[in-house]
C-alpha cells in the first residue's frame, strides 16, 4: 500500500477502470480508481476489497485424478516421461472457467507417442479451458493412457489428507483463487477542509475472470456479508428475539404458481427472466446453477427442489419471497407465513 499527496479534486463518488490489459492467457491486469473518499475511508475500502478479492472469489479447478493401478503418487508409468506426482502438479496448474457448482467429472484418454496438454481434457459442457497449451505429460511410447478427473468449484486453498486410495485416485490440493494478486494505493488531494482521498486498486487474475468481473463479484460478496445486519435493523428485532425465534414450516412455490395463475392469468411467466427481479448476486447464482432462468422455472420448483441447490439458504428463500411480492402485484398475503 502506497500513500501519496497529489493535487486535484472530484465532486461525486465514482469509480473508473483506468487501465486494462491481457499479458497472457493466464494473466489479466486491471487498474481502478474510486474517489472522492473522506480521510480513512480509502484504507477501509482497500483492505476489505483486497481480502474479498483474494479469499472470497470462487474458482474452478481439478481436485482429484484417478490413474488406475498405480501403487503411489511417486510411481512412474512405463512409456510416460513424468512421474505420477509431476502429472498431478501439472493438473493442479490447469486454469478452468465455468459457472458450475458441485462436483463434475472429466477425463483424458489418448494414445502415444505424443504430448498431452490441457486441450486433451474431455470436459462437461459448462467448463472451458483458459489455456489449452498447458502441459500435462509426455507419452514416449505407443501406449493407451487414461485419467479420470474430478472438477469442483470452490474458494480459497483446499488441502486433503493423503490416503492410500485402493482405486488408484489421488487428491489434488486445489487452489480455487482466480485472483493472483491485489495491490492498492491511496492518494491525498486538496487542502484543509477540502482534503479527500483517491483509492487506486490493481488486480491481477489468472484469466478465468477479468479484473472487472472479479471486482464486481468481490463487491457483491461484501454487500451480501452485511445484509443480515440491515435486515435485522429493518425488522426491528433484537438479538434475544432472533435467538428464540421459531422458523415456521416452509411455503411451497407450487402454491405461489397456482395463486399467480389465478390472479394474473395474462402474465407470460416464461418471458420474465430472473435477471429482472433484482435478486442479490448470491441468490441469482444459486438459481442459475440450478438452470432456473425464468419466473416459470422458479415457481415450478418445490421447496425441496430449491433447498437441494448447493449453498441455497433460508435467507435466499425469504429474499425470493420479498422480491416476488415487490414486483408482482398479486394477493398472496393469505398464504404468507411470518418470518
UniProtKB/Swiss-Prot annotation:
The Swiss-Prot or TrEMBL record annotates one GO molecular function as:
protein dimerization activity
Enzyme Commission number(s) from the entry = 2.7.7.6
Q: What is the effect of changing residue 260 to P?
A: In strain: Isolate PI578675
Does Plastid show up as a keyword for this record? yes
Q: Which SMART domains match?
A: RPOLD
Recorded hits in SUPFAM superfamilies, A to Z, give: C-terminal domain of RNA polymerase alpha subunit, Insert subdomain of RNA polymerase alpha subunit, RBP11-like subunits of RNA polymerase
Which GO BP annotation is one of this protein's?
DNA-templated transcription
For this protein, what reaction is catalysed?
RNA(n) + a ribonucleoside 5'-triphosphate = RNA(n+1) + diphosphate
Gene3D superfamilies assigned: 5' to 3' exonuclease, C-terminal subdomain, DNA-directed RNA polymerase, insert domain, RNA polymerase, RBP11-like subunit
Subunit structure, as described in the record: In plastids the minimal PEP RNA polymerase catalytic core is composed of four subunits: alpha, beta, beta', and beta''. When a (nuclear-encoded) sigma factor is associated with the core the holoenzyme is formed, which can initiate transcription.
What is known about what this protein does? Answer: DNA-dependent RNA polymerase catalyzes the transcription of DNA into RNA using the four ribonucleoside triphosphates as substrates.
Recorded family membership: Belongs to the RNA polymerase alpha chain family.
| Name of this protein | DNA-directed RNA polymerase subunit alpha
Species for this entry: Elymus canadensis
Amino acid at each position: 500500500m502506497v500513500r501519496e499527496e497529489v493535487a486535484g479534486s472530484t465532486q461525486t463518488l465514482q469509480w473508473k477502470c483506468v487501465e486494462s490489459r491481457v499479458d497472457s492467457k493466464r494473466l489479466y491486469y486491471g487498474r481502478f480508481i474510486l474517489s472522492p473518499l473522506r480521510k480513512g475511508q480509502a484504507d477501509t475500502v482497500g483492505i476489505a476489497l483486497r481480502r474479498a478479492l483474494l479469499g472470497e472469489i470462487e474458482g474452478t479447478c481439478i481436485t482429484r485424478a484417478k490413474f488406475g493401478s498405480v501403487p503411489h503418487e511417486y510411481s512412474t508409468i512405463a512409456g510416460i516421461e513424468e512421474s505420477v506426482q509431476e502429472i498431478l502438479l501439472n493438473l493442479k496448474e490447469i486454469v478452468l472457467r465455468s459457472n458450475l457448482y458441485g462436483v463434475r467429472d472429466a477425463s483424458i484418454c489418448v494414445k502415444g507417442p505424443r504430448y498431452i496438454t490441457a486441450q486433451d481434457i474431455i470436459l462437461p459442457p459448462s467448463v472451458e479451458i483458459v489455456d489449452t497449451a498447458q502441459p500435462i505429460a509426455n507419452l514416449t511410447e505407443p501406449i493407451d493412457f487414461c485419467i479420470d478427473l474430478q472438477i469442483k468449484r470452490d474458494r480459497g486453498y483446499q488441502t486433503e489428507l493423503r490416503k492410500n486410495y485402493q482405486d488408484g485416485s489421488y487428491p489434488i490440493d486445489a487452489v480455487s483463487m482466480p485472483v493472483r494478486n491485489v495491490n492498492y494505493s491511496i492518494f491525498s488531494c486538496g487542502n484543509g477542509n477540502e482534503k479527500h482521498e483517491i483509492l487506486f486498486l490493481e488486480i491481477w487474475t489468472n484469466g478465468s475472470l477479468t479484473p472487472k468481473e472479479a471486482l464486481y463479484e468481490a463487491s457483491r460478496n461484501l454487500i451480501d456479508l452485511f445484509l443480515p445486519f440491515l435486515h435485522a435493523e429493518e425488522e426491528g428485532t433484537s438479538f434475544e428475539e432472533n435467538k428464540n425465534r421459531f422458523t415456521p414450516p416452509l411455503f411451497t412455490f407450487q402454491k405461489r404458481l397456482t395463486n399467480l395463475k389465478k390472479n394474473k392469468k395474462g402474465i407470460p411467466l416464461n418471458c420474465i427472466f430472473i435477471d429482472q427481479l433484482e435478486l442479490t448476486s448470491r441468490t441469482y447464482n444459486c438459481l442459475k446453477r440450478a438452470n432456473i432462468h425464468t419466473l416459470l422455472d422458479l415457481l415450478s420448483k418445490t421447496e425441496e427442489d430449491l433447498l437441494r441447490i448447493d449453498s441455497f439458504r433460508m435467507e435466499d428463500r425469504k429474499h425470493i419471497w420479498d422480491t416476488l411480492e415487490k414486483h408482482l402485484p398479486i394477493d398472496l398475503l393469505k398464504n404468507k407465513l411470518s418470518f
